[in-house]
């Protein structure tokens, strides 16, 4: 089988969770005898030295150039005789699906790597994250931002409904990370969900009440430094407020380039 992964950035496993999972999937599919290709929008020269398991190709135009990229996408599927497309960022690429449906026997799987309503639920927090000045004008601006939140959430939900409507129009399967996200998905797309599947985390571990190793008074964060999803800034802000009360503790942040 010829399998094509599509995602905006290359699958360097140190870049993030989606990239690591995709790298592992590519290797496993290849091990099982399948032919795997990857198609991206961004060519990152700083990550070209990694031994990617599958050949990487790139869209010739910006993401917003849907018609041009769509024609390229269809030609690419034909040239490489792709049987299955695994889209790791459906909200970016669903506008290309219609170009593949003129071809026979191309199966599309759209993978959602987050809660479909995750940002919607916390949009108010995002809007209010930047604290204004403690002045009359600063307080007026804060009130204005609070008043705008319902409209921002309304507009954002309509955008989600449009995006997911486009995804379901052509995809053969939509994969969630958990069946617990189905109620939120239902709020966005309330039609037939028979094509929805979920692959939850298969790893379960028993609670460890007693351990033999010595513990340090250390708070350890391991992950990429990214604001919207990881909220590392909030962790640092909290630590800034409390660290003087706990002088024998330390906060350690480890990310892909070091410590």
Please state what every model-predicted region is:
Residues 145-195, 205:
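A short, active-site helix/loop in glycosyltransferases that binds the activated sugar's phosphate group
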Residues 40-43, 222, 250-259:
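Glycosyltransferase donor-sugar binding loop
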């Amino acid at each position: 089988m010829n399998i094509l992964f599509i995602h905006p950035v290359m699958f360097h496993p140190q870049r993030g969770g989606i990239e690591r999972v995709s790298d592992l999937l590519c290797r496993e599919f290849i091990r099982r005898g399948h032919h795997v290709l990857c198609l991206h929008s961004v060519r990152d020269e700083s990550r070209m030295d990694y031994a990617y398991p599958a050949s990487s190709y790139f869209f010739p135009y910006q993401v917003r150039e849907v018609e041009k990229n769509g024609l390229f996408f269809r030609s690419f599927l034909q040239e490489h005789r792709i049987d299955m497309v695994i889209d790791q960022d459906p909200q970016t690429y669903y506008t290309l699906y219609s170009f593949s449906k003129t071809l026979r026997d191309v199966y599309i799987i759209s993978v959602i790597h987050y809660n479909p309503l995750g940002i919607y639920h916390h949009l108010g927090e995002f809007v209010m994250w930047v604290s204004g000045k403690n002045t009359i004008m600063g307080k007026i601006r804060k009130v204005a931002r609070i008043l705008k939140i319902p409209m921002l959430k309304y507009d954002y939900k309509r955008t989600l409904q449009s995006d997911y409507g486009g995804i379901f129009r052509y995809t053969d399967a939509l994969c969630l990370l958990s069946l617990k996200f189905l109620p939120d998905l239902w709020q966005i797309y309330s039609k037939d969900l028979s094509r929805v599947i979920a692959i939850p985390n298969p790893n379960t571990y028993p609670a460890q009440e007693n351990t033999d190793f010595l513990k340090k008074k250390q708070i350890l964060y391991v992950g990429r430094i990214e604001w919207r999803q990881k909220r590392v800034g909030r962790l640092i802000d909290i630590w800034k407020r409390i660290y003087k009360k706990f002088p024998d503790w330390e906060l350690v942040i480890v990310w892909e380039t070091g410590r």
